[in-house]
Amino acid sequence: MSEPAENCSPRWKDEAIQNGYIPSYLDKDELCVVCGDKATGYHYRCITCEGCKGFFRRTIQKNLNPTYACKYEGKCVIDKVTRNQCQECRFKKCIAVGMATDLVLDDSKRLAKRKLIEENRERRRKEELQKTVWDRLEPTQEEWDLIRMVTEAHMATNAQGNHWKQKRKFLSAAGVKEDKPEEIGQASMANTPEGNKVDIEAFSQFTKIITPAITRVVDFAKKLPMFCELPCEDQIILLKGCCMEIMSLRAAVRYDPESETLTLNGEMAVTRGQLKNGGLGVVSDAIFDLGVSLSSFNLDDSEVALLQAVILLSSDRPGLSSVERIEPCQEEFLLAFEHYINYRKHKLAHFWPKLLMKVTDLRMIGACHASRFLHMKVECPTELFPPLFLEVFED
């Protein structure tokens, strides 16, 4: 077997090194219009070789043409042999064939152009990298199964499904007035300080739907195997912690900009004022603000379901004994959630972090409601509170 030759390289590479790079728009045998050497492309509006391109650029950038002087009265023939013998005639021929002095950039413009090219190159690199990231982060088969499971759990426990607009009834139809408490009539108002007044009639309407709303949250949780595998005590803590947050989320995603109402439990459409007067006070503002904000997100059922699962499996609820089991469950949903968002809405900048911030908003609503609940117990007759409502929200 013969030994390989030293410095061997493919023939095409040797030819490329010898001939130089030729753009695809040039014929293979195209010649420089200044000196007749092999052309390498359009330079300053003419087809030239690299040598004449560089000569012309240096002449303009350094303003050298006044220093050029021909020894033969400006009548030199310029070709690839004589081009370096007379700079004046070479420059005159550059001008004569049409090379444009205005296309030669000075140092500052050249640096700016180079910077722009580098920035564009870096931008394209990042776009390609981002595209690769999005492509790579499509949910795995296991994550798709998790998404399908939690979506089915949500839809099975979500009152009226996607037909809530057709099925809803406005609270005003039940004879409950709205907005200013003083317009509702003092007879129906609990005797409490201004700003904390509760419309007893509205509150009694809300209590009719609160038990089925809570029951649906519990049913949703019980459809998640990882939740059911937790100790009973931890299940209770998680449900008590997330119940108001999930009910608020379910109401917020049913905000209707046209009527400026939220639909509670898929059936009762209420205004901001009615919800406030019905017992929630300032908490109603937070829920409505969340609804207004979420209306621009156009969340689908899977996104709402995943958001609920993340809220349910919050391992920082006080009193939990199985934090080390709950944390991985929440992480599993978070990762599937992120991949699902990246897969579906990768063209929307910062969509995932903005959506994740809504978890913080919902936690704030839950905390505010816990404080508000103490006032409601003072303001409203005890017999109006459904047993399940008290069981969930009392410490």
Swiss-Prot record:
<dbReference type="GO" id="GO:0004879">
    <property type="term" value="F:nuclear receptor activity"/>
</dbReference>
<dbReference type="GO" id="GO:0070324">
    <property type="term" value="F:thyroid hormone binding"/>
</dbReference>
<dbReference type="GO" id="GO:0045944">
    <property type="term" value="P:positive regulation of transcription by RNA polymerase II"/>
</dbReference>
<feature type="zinc finger region" description="NR C4-type">
    <location>
        <begin position="70"/>
        <end position="94"/>
    </location>
</feature>
<dbReference type="GO" id="GO:0030154">
    <property type="term" value="P:cell differentiation"/>
</dbReference>
<feature type="region of interest" description="Modulating">
    <location>
        <begin position="1"/>
        <end position="31"/>
    </location>
</feature>
<feature type="binding site">
    <location>
        <position position="216"/>
    </location>
    <ligand>
        <name>L-thyroxine</name>
    </ligand>
</feature>
<dbReference type="GO" id="GO:0000978">
    <property type="term" value="F:RNA polymerase II cis-regulatory region sequence-specific DNA binding"/>
</dbReference>
<keyword id="KW-0863">Zinc-finger</keyword>
<keyword id="KW-0539">Nucleus</keyword>
<dbReference type="Pfam" id="PF00104">
    <property type="entry name" value="Hormone_recep"/>
</dbReference>
<dbReference type="GO" id="GO:0000122">
    <property type="term" value="P:negative regulation of transcription by RNA polymerase II"/>
</dbReference>
<dbReference type="InterPro" id="IPR000536">
    <property type="entry name" value="Nucl_hrmn_rcpt_lig-bd"/>
</dbReference>
<dbReference type="InterPro" id="IPR013088">
    <property type="entry name" value="Znf_NHR/GATA"/>
</dbReference>
<comment type="function">
    <text>Nuclear hormone receptor that can act as a repressor or activator of transcription. High affinity receptor for thyroid hormones, including triiodothyronine and thyroxine.</text>
</comment>
<dbReference type="InterPro" id="IPR050234">
    <property type="entry name" value="Nuclear_hormone_rcpt_NR1"/>
</dbReference>
<feature type="binding site">
    <location>
        <position position="32"/>
    </location>
    <ligand>
        <name>Zn(2+) 1</name>
    </ligand>
</feature>
<feature type="binding site">
    <location>
        <position position="49"/>
    </location>
    <ligand>
        <name>Zn(2+) 1</name>
    </ligand>
</feature>
<keyword id="KW-0805">Transcription regulation</keyword>
<dbReference type="InterPro" id="IPR001728">
    <property type="entry name" value="ThyrH_rcpt"/>
</dbReference>
<feature type="binding site">
    <location>
        <position position="35"/>
    </location>
    <ligand>
        <name>Zn(2+) 1</name>
    </ligand>
</feature>
<dbReference type="GO" id="GO:0002154">
    <property type="term" value="P:thyroid hormone receptor signaling pathway"/>
</dbReference>
<feature type="binding site">
    <location>
        <position position="265"/>
    </location>
    <ligand>
        <name>L-thyroxine</name>
    </ligand>
</feature>
<keyword id="KW-0238">DNA-binding</keyword>
<feature type="DNA-binding region" description="Nuclear receptor">
    <location>
        <begin position="32"/>
        <end position="99"/>
    </location>
</feature>
<dbReference type="GO" id="GO:0090575">
    <property type="term" value="C:RNA polymerase II transcription regulator complex"/>
</dbReference>
<feature type="binding site">
    <location>
        <position position="89"/>
    </location>
    <ligand>
        <name>Zn(2+) 2</name>
    </ligand>
</feature>
<feature type="zinc finger region" description="NR C4-type">
    <location>
        <begin position="32"/>
        <end position="52"/>
    </location>
</feature>
<feature type="binding site">
    <location>
        <position position="52"/>
    </location>
    <ligand>
        <name>Zn(2+) 1</name>
    </ligand>
</feature>
<feature type="binding site">
    <location>
        <position position="216"/>
    </location>
    <ligand>
        <name>3,3',5-triiodo-L-thyronine</name>
    </ligand>
</feature>
<dbReference type="InterPro" id="IPR001628">
    <property type="entry name" value="Znf_hrmn_rcpt"/>
</dbReference>
<feature type="binding site">
    <location>
        <position position="76"/>
    </location>
    <ligand>
        <name>Zn(2+) 2</name>
    </ligand>
</feature>
<feature type="binding site">
    <location>
        <position position="369"/>
    </location>
    <ligand>
        <name>L-thyroxine</name>
    </ligand>
</feature>
<dbReference type="InterPro" id="IPR001723">
    <property type="entry name" value="Nuclear_hrmn_rcpt"/>
</dbReference>
<protein>
    <recommendedName>
        <fullName>Thyroid hormone receptor beta</fullName>
    </recommendedName>
</protein>
<dbReference type="InterPro" id="IPR035500">
    <property type="entry name" value="NHR-like_dom_sf"/>
</dbReference>
<keyword id="KW-0862">Zinc</keyword>
<feature type="binding site">
    <location>
        <position position="369"/>
    </location>
    <ligand>
        <name>3,3',5-triiodo-L-thyronine 1</name>
    </ligand>
</feature>
<keyword id="KW-0804">Transcription</keyword>
<dbReference type="Pfam" id="PF00105">
    <property type="entry name" value="zf-C4"/>
</dbReference>
<keyword id="KW-0675">Receptor</keyword>
<dbReference type="GO" id="GO:0048384">
    <property type="term" value="P:retinoic acid receptor signaling pathway"/>
</dbReference>
